Regions:
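A non-catalytic alpha/beta surface segment that caps or lines the substrate-entry region
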Residues: 110-114, 119
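Short, contiguous alpha-helical
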Residues: 100
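Small-residue-centered hinge/linker elements
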Residues: 2-89, 94, 106, 120-229, ...
């Protein structure tokens, strides 16, 4: 850790924002057709606080994520989970850097130039040698330089990231264009060189109609070749809908798999 750095070890939490009073002051009325006790996405517009059902599910979600984080850190840093909880209760976010080392959350204090020197030692390089390195964003361009596979045995990876939209318009945020994705899945279905497809899903859901159209294309794709879903941070609502037609689904222990939306 940098001598002037910090580690935000203070547990997990969330703070929802509610707009009901604002909506009332503006003279607006929100009309909601809601199905299911735990369908909570519209609560910010119709309530001033969390419903018991939503608080229950959000608490369970946070506890699951926090327990997983604790378990992983405990295994890697060899610190008991009770001790990690005690550190979090102290809100270890504004401590002196030395304290993180004393607590076992960091090994030592180093500035960036010292880290580079340390890496050179680990790799057997001289101090004057250049250390070749890549930032994560540099990896984006790697696939552009990979020769096209001509073996006729390709495993395709299709990324389904963002909200599912029937008509994305001019949105600059990551989104799943329903028509574009359906067309892409059809191309993979008809490509004889593609022997299997990995569908990487990281989506909060979106259009129910659009999700159903994508689901249909996944079903048709699976008729000709295996389809495996790999879930990212979340696969909620329509995100899970488009995933459930796959042959196999793999998710991280902290992946949010839920349905939170109302019609």
């Amino acid at each position: 850790i940098n001598p002037q750095g910090s580690i935000g070890w203070h547990g997990a939490g969330m703070q929802p924002v509610f707009f009901k009073n604002l909506v009332s002051k503006l003279g607006l009325e929100i009309q909601v057709f809601r199905v299911g006790t735990y369908k909570s996405a519209v609560e910010p517009f119709i309530a001033t606080e969390m419903s018991p059902a939503n608080r229950e599910q959000m608490t369970e979600c946070l506890e699951s994520v926090w327990n997983r984080i604790q378990a992983d850190v405990s295994d890697s840093r060899h610190i008991p989970t009770d001790t990690l909880n005690a550190y979090a209760d102290r809100y270890m976010d504004f401590c002196q850097a030395e304290e993180y080392v004393q607590c076992g959350l960091a090994d030592t204090l180093m500035y960036k130039d010292e880290v580079i020197s340390y890496l050179k030692q680990l790799s057997g390089r001289d101090e004057d040698d250049k250390l070749n390195s890549l930032f994560i964003e540099d990896m984006i361009n790697v696939k552009k330089n990979v020769p096209k596979d001509k073996s006729g045995n390709v495993i395709a990876v299709y990324y389904a990231y963002g909200e599912i939209l029937d008509a994305p318009g001019s949105s600059t945020e990551d989104c799943i264009d329903v028509q574009k994705m359906c067309k892409g899945l059809r191309k993979l279905r008809d490509n004889d060189d593609v022997k299997a497809v990995v569908l990487r899903v990281n989506s909060p859901g979106g259009s129910a109609y659009g999700s159903d159209q994508i689901w249909r294309e996944v079903v048709r794709l699976k008729e000709k070749k295996p389809v495996i879903v790999s879930m990212g941070d979340y696969a909620a609502s329509g995100g899970y809908y488009i995933s459930c037609a796959a042959d196999r689904i793999f998710a991280d222990p902290t992946t949010l798999i839920l349905s939170a939306y109302s019609a």
